[in-house]
């Protein structure tokens, strides 16, 4: 039910942002609702206009995952913006569940754009596509060369830290 999804979204939000106790949706004029987050310690209702960008992005992220009619694909542009790296790791763990099991038992394809080496450290090389412009100004998308000896040696040298490996330009995606 919608209530179950809301409760799960609220639970996930409180796990990701521990100082939040709950979500309040006070009714305004003309049957509109506003979003307020309830502080765990003071019980103060914080209007959306006073909530940090990172917390709002996490709320939007969760809303996309827990919407009523789960789509077959969900896209996030620069998921890392405004989000603490520890929270980003937790969000990526949730996305792994969503992409393999789904929220309602149906896996969802997840597409994320990023410029973050931190985020790259949370994914497997076979899940990454590098995007760059060629010399004619056309966008090129390619898989990482995971079968190449050069790539494997470089990945091993960086202890599997794909984000750090990105700086070596061994798989592209860097402006030149």
Question: What name fits each language-model region?
Answer:
Residues 19-22, 27-168:
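Switch/communication elements of ASCE P-loop NTPase nucleotide-binding domains
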Residues 1-27:
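Amphipathic alpha-helical domain-onset/packing element
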Residues 12-15, 164, 171-176:
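Feature primarily recognizes SF3-like P-loop helicase cores of small DNA viruses
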